[in-house]
């Protein structure tokens, strides 16, 4: 599917009133679920708060996390104290599944004004709406992604990541700050197999929700690009009906084979950071 209500995502849409209304309402809901209906705790919250509020101008922020439930976003932000989820200008942009969040015009409008970018699962890393996500990074905004690509509620190591987040890092003119976050307990609040394989109609109460913020992941993108280009020279390009566009990153031109090497390297580093943080979260 092409662009969905992109006009509703603009900050000047109807003077910003719909965005302010939706974000304030969703934030109130998230805080109620996280702090009134459940008990929540956040570890290393200041790292995220400082990056959201006072990172260098023009530098984008990407937060990456595991995906435990359909309510991870926005409830995980409701666990933070202060204005993290209440300020419409500072609030995150988030990649959201088109088949869940954009099923009809009403849902589409609400999620669009709430700073959600529709993504077609299985649509590839160069689908049309990924360009909008890239534009948000070019604007220096904060973008949240779930690089696992779907909800996983088992307490197992972080699975192989999809390449969408890696492609955004590589394509961004300014290398984003990438911050890993792990959360636990959300699978109990919104279990996938609650009632004959269905989710509960409302979040379940009296659960302990835990959010653990890591430290920014260090990426030497120019070195990773150089390595990807060198490694790709010894690999036969894959046969595909639709070729990826040529990418220029860190001053080098990458064909599809080189891009695959780069995206694998970036994704593996994010996956490793998330897994390290997941193990830490289990001990806290």
From Swiss-Prot:
GO terms for cellular component: plasma membrane. Essentially present in young tissues. Expressed in roots, cotyledons, leaves, and shoot and root apical meristems. Its EC number is 2.3.1.-. GO terms for molecular function: acyltransferase activity; lysophospholipid acyltransferase activity. InterPro entries: Plipid/glycerol_acylTrfase, Tafazzin. Residues 122-163 are annotated as: Hydrophilic. Belongs to the taffazin family. Acyltransferase that catalyzes the N-acylation of phosphatidylethanolamine to form N-acylphosphatidylethanolamine (N-acyl-PE) (e.g. NAPEs containing C16:0, C16:1, C18:0, and C18:1). Also mediates the formation of acylphosphatidylglycerol (acyl-PG) from lysoglycerophospholipid by O-acylation. Uses acyl-CoA as acyl donors. Acylates 1-acyllysophosphatidylethanolamine (1-acyllyso-PE) and 1-acyllysophosphatidylglycerol (1-acyllyso-PG) at the sn-2-position. The HXXXXD motif is essential for acyltransferase activity and may constitute the binding site for the phosphate moiety of the glycerol-3-phosphocholine. This is N-acylphosphatidylethanolamine synthase.
């Amino acid at each position: 599917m092409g662009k969905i209500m992109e006009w509703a995502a603009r900050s000047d849409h109807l003077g910003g009133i719909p965005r302010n209304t939706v974000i304030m309402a969703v934030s109130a809901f998230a805080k109620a679920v996280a702090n009134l209906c459940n008990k929540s705790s956040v570890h290393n919250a200041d790292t995220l708060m400082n990056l959201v509020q006072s990172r260098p101008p023009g530098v984008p922020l990407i937060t990456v996390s595991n995906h435990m439930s359909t309510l991870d976003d926005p409830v995980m932000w409701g666990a933070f104290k202060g204005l993290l989820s209440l300020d419409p200008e500072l609030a995150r942009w988030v990649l959201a599944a088109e088949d869940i969040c954009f099923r009809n015009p009403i849902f589409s409008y609400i999620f669009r004004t709430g700073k959600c970018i529709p993504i077609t699962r299985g649509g590839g890393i160069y689908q049309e709406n990924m360009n909008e996500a890239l534009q948000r990074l070019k604007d220096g905004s904060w973008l949240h992604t779930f690089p696992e690509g779907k909800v996983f509620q088992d307490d197992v190591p972080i699975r192989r990541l999809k390449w969408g987040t890696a492609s955004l890092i590589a394509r961004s003119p300014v290398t984003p700050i990438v911050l890993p976050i792990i959360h636990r307990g959300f699978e109990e609040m919104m279990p996938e197999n609650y009632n004959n394989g269905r989710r509960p109609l409302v979040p379940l109460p009296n659960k302990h929700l835990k959010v653990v913020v890591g430290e920014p992941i260090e990426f030497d993108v120019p070195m990773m690009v150089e390595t990807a280009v060198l490694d790709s020279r010894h690999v036969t390009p894959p046969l595909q009906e639709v070729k990826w566009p040529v990418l220029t990153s860190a001053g080098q031109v990458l064909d599809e084979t080189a891009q695959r090497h780069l995206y694998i390297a970036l994704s593996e580093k994010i996956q490793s950071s998330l897994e390290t943080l997941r193990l830490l979260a289990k001990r806290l």
